[in-house]
Amino acid sequence: MKIKAPVITIDGPSGSGKGTVAGLLAKKLGWCLLDSGALYRLLAFAARNHGVDLTNEEALKLLAAHLDVQFETTAAGQGQRIILEGEDVTQAIRNEQIGSGASQVASLPAVRDALLMRQRAFQEEPGLVADGRDMGTVVFPDAPLKVFLTASAEERARRRYLQLKAKGDDVSLSSLLDEICARDERDTQRAVAPLKPAHDAIQLDSTELSIEQVLERILSEIALRDIAG
C-alpha cells in the first residue's frame, strides 16, 4: 500500500496570516502548496463572469466541477500565478468583493463536495502545506500537523487595510472591520464545514506575533513530530 505524502494544514479566519505563513512554510520545506481559498475565489470570479447567481447551488456545482484552472509557480519561485480559462487572474481574485462572494459559495454543500476531490489531489510528494478554513477538519483530517491560526478582528482588519493601501486602493478601516466580522459570522455559522479548529490542532493567536515568529513556532512543531524527515 502506497504511503501518502505528509500534509500540514493551516486553517483560520480571513486576515489571520495563514496564506502568507503557508507560502513561506511550503517554500522552506520544498513542499507543494494548496491555497484552498483561491479555489472558492476562482469560483466566485467565474460565476460573475458567466452570469451565474451566487445563490444558484446547482449551477455553481456544475461550474465548480468544470473550472479550467492551473496554479503555476512564478519564475522567481516567490509565489504562484493562478490561471483561469487561460487568463492570469492572480490579482483579479484578490479584492474584497470576490472574497465576500467566495464566502457565500463556500457555504453551499454541493459546491464544497464538488471541490473536495480537487483539493485532495494536491497531496503529492514530498509533502503538502494546505491553507484554508476546513483543511484540518474535512479535507485532510488525518494530517500529522494541524495549525489553527487566528488574530483579533481589529488586527486582521488593520493588516488588510495596510495591504490594500499599499496597492493604491481607497479603503476604509471601519468598513474592512465590518466585512471581516460579517465574514467571520458566515464562516463560523454555516451548516457545512464551519470554521473551527480541529480537535487536535495547534492553536496560535498571531495578534501580537510577527509572521517570522509564527513560522518558527510551526517549524518547531514539525521538528518535534519529525514530519519533514
Swiss-Prot record:
This is Cytidylate kinase. Transmembrane segments: none annotated. Pfam families: Cytidylate_kin. One of its GO terms (molecular function) is ATP binding. One of its GO terms (biological process) is pyrimidine nucleotide metabolic process. GO terms for cellular component: cytosol. It catalyses: CMP + ATP = CDP + ADP; dCMP + ATP = dCDP + ADP. Coiled coil: none annotated. Keywords: ATP-binding, Cytoplasm, Kinase, Nucleotide-binding, Transferase. Belongs to the cytidylate kinase family. Type 1 subfamily. The keyword Acyltransferase does not apply. CDD domains: CMPK. Its EC number is 2.7.4.25. ATP binds at residues 12-20. It is found in: Cytoplasm.
